[in-house]
Amino acid sequence: MGKIIGIDLGTTNSCVAVMDGDKPRVIENAEGDRTTPSIIAYTNDNETLVGQPAKRQAVTNPKNTLFAIKRLIGRRFEDNEVQRDVDIMPFKIIRADNGDAWVDVKGDKLAPPQVSAEVLKKMKKTAEDFLGETVTEAVITVPAYFNDAQRQATKDAGRIAGLDVKRIINEPTAAALAYGLDKGKGNQTIAVYDLGGGTFDLSIIEIDEVGGEKTFEVLATNGDTHLGGEDFDNRVINYLVDEFKKEQGVDLRNDPLAMQRLKEAGEKAKIELSSAQQTDVNLPYITADATGPKHLNIKLTRAKLEALVEDLVARSMEPVKVALKDAGLSVSEIDDVILVGGQTRMPLVQQKVAEFFGKEPRKDVNPDEAVAVGAAVQGGVLSGNVTDVLLLDVTPLSLGIETMGGVMTTLIEKNTTIPTKKSQVFSTAEDNQSAVTIHVLQGERKQASANKSLGQFNLEGINPAPRGMPQIEVTFDIDADGIIHVSAKDKGTGKEQQITIKASSGLSDEEIQQMVRDAEANADADRKFEELVQARNQADALVHATRKQLTEAGDKLSADDKAPIEKAVSELEDAVKGDDKDAIEAKSQALIQVSEKLMQAAQQQAQANTQGQQSQGGNDDGVVDAEFEEVKDNK
């Protein structure tokens, strides 16, 4: 079996590693560097450049030099994060036919996985040059808070690059593998703070050692897939542009060439200020107007830089609090803090992390290489070369389906260890319903419409039966890559339908963050909505039962006896259309009271049926009414 390489496909830089004997080794690229810029350029000679060669020519070819493509992968063009990038990127971001965010290079439309594949190809070639053999298999890392669409798109990029992606693993988990592999015996709980070029993750991981085998179990994860070093760079660039405009009266934002030079200078200044207190940004001949050439020369202090990005660092601390809460741990129960990602070299970041956790973060983990090293370790596990490591990761978001009354019924809670499989039995909402629609949702809200729709599919050919009788078993299966598969099976006929959630319905991180924030802020509103839906469902069931009894009673009830019952049914149906829970409950009680004569008339005839339904109901424990669309055969 060939080697399975480990690739950290980063927003700013990428890295590749492999197990060399029993030790992971980071491989130098053709330029002699251990990391490769995630930059791709398309030249006028139709040549594709990747890494340092692409970065070197960026100033003279800004519109055809692509960077930070990971921020677009698996995203919709309409996403707020994409729209922000549309305004600041020198290259053209466009809407694809399927609604995804793509890029336009010289009139050619390119999908982000297609572009990222160029970086993966270079990583593959780097490994092949070192190993002297063809590489076909890889473990690729993604931010822990990447959703299903983004994970799918990353796997697609691997396929385009000619790699069989054996596993997608989360970056903080990979870093924990790199950290914990050579540490001494004993159990410990660590926090991995991963602030990279474009994404942020925080994972709480427990490392246990039992009988010589190390288990890495993720207790909780949280993050922001649109927060990273690129955002810090943009703050510096905007400051330099504004200062230059004040001094010279020229806005450089309209000049792609000048902006590309500023991007390089801004990133360089930010890096220098991690070790120096002050730096000069000096760009001669940055632009020109009628009065002649203009030169940019601006002093930037560390204090000014920290003031520019203070809110970004503060923003990173919110997911830290949520992850700790989800793990059920206090700060004092964290034994070690590991910093991953180049942006964690910034003194302000290190200071804020140390203040929050009450301890200095570890300095013995290389923030640029740890993720690739961990991916290589996982590659060793999958190929059987590493046998004493077990990795248990989690899914970052709750998953479920829409059920009767527009409620999301959760089957798999967030922070559930993966791979995982969960089934629940649902039923029909109408008599003689021949088909159901399974609507798959991702999020933390009770109200189905407040969550993200991942897809839907039909299960047809259900045998005609009264509502509540058919048993539809819905199964959610999340594989080790965190990718979702859903199936529905009619237990009566054995018919089954399934779906693998496709990447075309990407879920943005801002939406995820908003879902969690909304779920916390709107807990009371969610509770009231749930109570309203419950009242509606009970009222619907009461109306259904009353109408059925009226039909069965036939001429045993006089028209005078039927009139008030039919009026009460009509009033209850009107109340159900509204949003007043108290009114629905009052009209339900009124219907029960006027239905007394009907109950007496129908009692004898319905007794046998009622007993049968009760015994059937005893076997239906845990069956949830689901609101499904009936698919008409004659359509």
UniProtKB/Swiss-Prot annotation:
This is Chaperone protein DnaK. GO terms for molecular function: ATP binding; ATP-dependent protein folding chaperone; unfolded protein binding. Acts as a chaperone. Belongs to the heat shock protein 70 family. The lineage of its organism: Bacteria, Pseudomonadati, Pseudomonadota, Gammaproteobacteria, Pasteurellales. Residues 600-618 have a biased composition (Low complexity). It comes from the Bacteria. Induction: By stress conditions e.g. heat shock. CDD domains: ASKHA_NBD_HSP70_DnaK-like. Pfam families: HSP70 (PF00012). Keywords: ATP-binding, Chaperone, Nucleotide-binding, Phosphoprotein, Stress response. The modification Phosphothreonine is found at T199. Residues 598-635 are annotated as: Disordered.
